[in-house]
């Protein structure tokens, strides 16, 4: 009995470690994306990221095939469209127009937005403290967007449009999560995530290829996919974004969440906005004004309040 209890404790410890590592890797996603965006446009960067993610999810695709009905395929394709091209193109076009620290703080509102969406669309109960947390998170986001320091010692400055694009990507992510939840009633989270990543990556390929082929018609300046002139730094950033920040985090989170209480594991989602904003300030020379710091504290405080009170926000289906 003692040995069994010790083994259970070790598994639980590893589960917390897996969730913490996933949250930490998620927190670096905007930083690596910013490095890659110095050498290519958003569409190319997101495509490369998910091509690397496909490599990381290959064992799941090869080892755990799923039989989807025609209706499930339609839901899957809609889920992939929301979850990959629409969400990430909006998010990183926003990052181009704002800073890593601002974008990271915005993402901190995700647990609260998810709880609100579950209450509105899925009939889950959100108590008075939950609604207060939602109001605090909304006020915090408004303070970051409208009251943040528009001056920075780095190369980028935050803008209202950039911050709003990041917020729009979070709303798109809510639609993706609610659709994914339906698929996960009959299929495991890793399988649904793998199929979503592969389907969404094919959509990104079609978008990039179609934009390039239609260049003579649209008269837009579309550059070919960069290869030879991409630096080693950018390739490393892209590989880390896809293999570690997307594929590995998904597998770590899905394993960890099944060995620890969901309400406790959810707190590790809050590592992402905190670490992301720190990386932006410390490594990229960005600055946050006093209102942005206060707004960020409200966002994180609201998220921690929800994720430590036992309210399950379905963190197993979150994809970064």
Segments from the language model and where they lie:
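Specific transmembrane alpha-helical segments of multi-pass solute transporters/efflux pumps
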Residues: 24-30, 58-107, 117, 143, ...
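Transmembrane alpha-helices of multi-pass small-molecule transport proteins
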Residues: 14-15, 38-86, 113-117, 171-179, ...
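Cytoplasmic-side transmembrane-helix entry/capping segments in multi-pass membrane proteins
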Residues: 19, 71-80, 126-139, 187-196
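Transmembrane alpha-helical segments that form core, pore/gating elements
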Residues: 23, 31, 54-57, 114-116, ...
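Juxtamembrane helix-loop boundary signature in multi-pass membrane transporters
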Residues: 1-21, 66, 109-171, 291, ...
């Amino acid at each position: 009995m003692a040995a069994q209890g010790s083994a259970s404790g070790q598994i639980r410890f590893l589960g917390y470690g897996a969730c913490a590592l996933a949250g930490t890797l998620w927190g670096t996603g905007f930083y690596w994306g910013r490095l890659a965006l110095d050498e290519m446009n958003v569409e190319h960067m997101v495509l490369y990221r998910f091509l690397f993610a496909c490599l990381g999810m290959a064992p799941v695709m090869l080892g755990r095939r799923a039989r989807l009905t025609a209706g499930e395929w339609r839901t899957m394709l809609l889920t992939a469209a929301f979850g990959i091209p629409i969400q990430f193109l909006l998010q990183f076009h926003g990052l181009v127009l704002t800073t890593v620290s601002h974008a990271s703080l915005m993402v901190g509102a995700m647990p609260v937005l998810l709880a609100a969406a579950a209450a509105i669309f899925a009939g889950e109960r959100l108590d008075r403290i939950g609604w207060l947390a939602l109001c605090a998170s909304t006020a915090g986001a408004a303070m970051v967007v409208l009251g943040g320091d528009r001056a920075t010692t780095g190369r980028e400055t935050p803008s209202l449009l950039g911050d709003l694009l990041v917020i729009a990507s979070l709303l798109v992510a809510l639609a993706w999560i609610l659709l994914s939840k339906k698929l996960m009633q009959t299929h495991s989270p890793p399988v649904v995530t793998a199929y979503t990543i592969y389907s969404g990556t094919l959509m990104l390929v079609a978008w990039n290829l179609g934009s390039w082929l239609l260049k003579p018609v649209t008269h837009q300046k579309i550059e070919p996919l960069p290869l030879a002139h991409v630096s080693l730094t950018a390739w490393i950033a892209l590989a880390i974004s896809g293999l570690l920040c997307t594929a590995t985090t998904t597998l770590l989170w899905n394993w960890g969440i099944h060995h620890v209480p969901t309400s406790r594991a959810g707190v590790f989602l809050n590592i992402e906005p905190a670490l992301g904003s720190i990386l932006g300030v410390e490594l990229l020379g960005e600055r946050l004004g006093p209102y942005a710091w206060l707004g960020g504290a409200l966002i994180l405080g609201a998220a921690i309040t929800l994720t430590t009170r036992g309210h399950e926000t379905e963190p197993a289906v979150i994809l970064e």
